[in-house]
Amino acid sequence: MEPFTHNDGNRDELIIQQKRDIEKEISDTTPLVSEQLPLTCLYAEYSGDEIFTAKIQDLSKKYKFIRRTRPDGNCFFRAFAYSYLEYLISNTSAYQEFKKLAEESKEKLVQLGFPSFTLEDFHETFMEVIQRVSPDNAGGHSTVQDELHKIFNEQGYSDYVVVYLRLITSGKLQEEADFYQNFIEGDLTIEAFRHLEVEPMYKESDHIHIIALCTALGAGVRVEYLDRGEGGTVKAHDFPEGSEPRIYLIYRPGHYDILYPN
């Protein structure tokens, strides 16, 4: 093995700085959650690519709009939260059920061993966000929808929601550790996986995150996979299997955005 040199250190610093510059450019130019956009905007991203063009065409038979999320590793949790709250704005009884579940979630996490002082601020902010998008709030649906969009583009609120959903996901993995251990490749324990891949911000999500969160909150999600797979059609997967989806997401390698059915 060649000895470490000063140049190696400089190169590492340069790589780290380049990564920071890219992250800053993304945060400066990309909103946390975009406005609704026509699904056809995807064509421009894959111009000249026959496989993706055919799949976007297939997708457009089922969906009319897309809402982008910032590609920062938190996209699944942010997209999930925005889309589910958007659904709840129009469904008062489902909203009340979710609000009750959210209120009780902190105590459940404490019983699972999460320190109460760690949860306090995140849970408080989570409940504030839920209250601010209540279907009963003054101004009607469009006013509440505007409030939801405003909240999710305020970094503090938006990130606190993501953190709390990560904690709920981690709690579900701990609660049903024997079941979820089957989804983890390699020698990682559930505890190590939770601390390394679930609780930290900016860590990307996989099927295990989706299943755990959907199960914890009783919310069905349909994910449409836009990839290079054969067939010319987009494959969909419902989480949990057999559930009725309330949230529709599109997955492209490493990233989730929100979809709106026709």
Curated annotation (Swiss-Prot):
Pfam (any one): Peptidase_C65
Active site: D72, C75 (nucleophile), H255
Enzyme Commission no: 3.4.19.12
Catalytic activity field: Thiol-dependent hydrolysis of ester, thioester, amide, peptide and isopeptide bonds formed by the C-terminal Gly of ubiquitin (a 76-residue protein attached to proteins as an intracellular targeting signal)
Superkingdom to which the source organism belongs: Eukaryota
Keywords, comma-separated and alphabetical: Hydrolase, Protease, Thiol protease, Ubl conjugation pathway
Protein name: Ubiquitin thioesterase otubain-like
